[in-house]
Structure formats: structure tokens, C-alpha cells
Amino acid sequence: MAVELVHPEVNLNVTRQVDGPLIRKLSVSNFRNYSKVSLEPSQQMVVLLGNNGAGKTNLLEAISMLSPGRGLRRAQLTQLNRAKIDTTDEDNIIEAQRQWAVSVKVESNGFQTTIGTGCETTAADGKSAKRLVKINGEIVKSQ
């Protein structure tokens, strides 16, 4: 697949081949500053723009949680839960009580796969948690 990069300030047109897997849909809930967001990029290349603190790195961290390990910031699972809660909105209070989750629909060689991960609290105090991983809706056991 070819991607055309256009930079308006430099009048630069570049065509590049994209051979790797493409994220067709990203869904995030209760992750850092996001209560719920779903993105479906229409292009094969995406640039995230925004002010400091807008959540650009949080989206990248959410994607990084789909690989083995603790993500790009190496945070504890319980630290990834949404931090700010609007206590005037009952739906937000209920949603904030749930743990974080990240899901992507990935396309590679014409095939689509859904990969998801999230956190499940394992103690009443909410401080202990385990990570769950699903591929195409099936829970994957750790190796």
C-alpha cells in the first residue's frame, strides 16, 4: 500500500510503501484521561496533534499495552485507570468504577484480527490487579 505524505509548508510530496500491519480501529475506555474513545483512521499514516496534556501520549501508551510488558511508561496496571471523574454525571461515576481496556482491529495481508487487553481488580482494596488479553474475543492464557 502506498502512502502519500504532503507537507504544506515545504511543498514536499513523498510516496512510501507501508508493509506492516495497520490499525483500523482503536478503542480505549477508562484509560488515563479518556473515559471512552474510539478512533477509525481513514489513512494508513496518522499524526497526533494537540496541546500538552491533551492525551496524545496516552493513546500511544494504550497501544503499547497490547504488546508484552508494562507499556511505554512501565506503569502499574492500576495506575492506568482513568484519573479524573466528573462526579456530577452519574454515567461517568458508574463508568469510572470499571477498569481500563484497550482494543484494536488490526489488518495485515488482507486479514483482520481484534486484539484487546485490560485490567481486572483482584483485591477488594482495588490495588491488586491482573491483566487480561483477548484475541478475536477469546481469552489468551499467559505462557
Feature map (PLM): residue ranges:
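Intrinsically disordered, low-complexity segments used for protein-protein interactions
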Residues: M1, L5-P8, G116-T117, E138
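Pre-Walker A-like glycine/lysine-rich segment at the N-terminus of P-loop NTPase domains
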Residues: A2-M65, D86
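Nucleotide-state sensing region of NTPase/ATPase domains
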Residues: P68-Q143
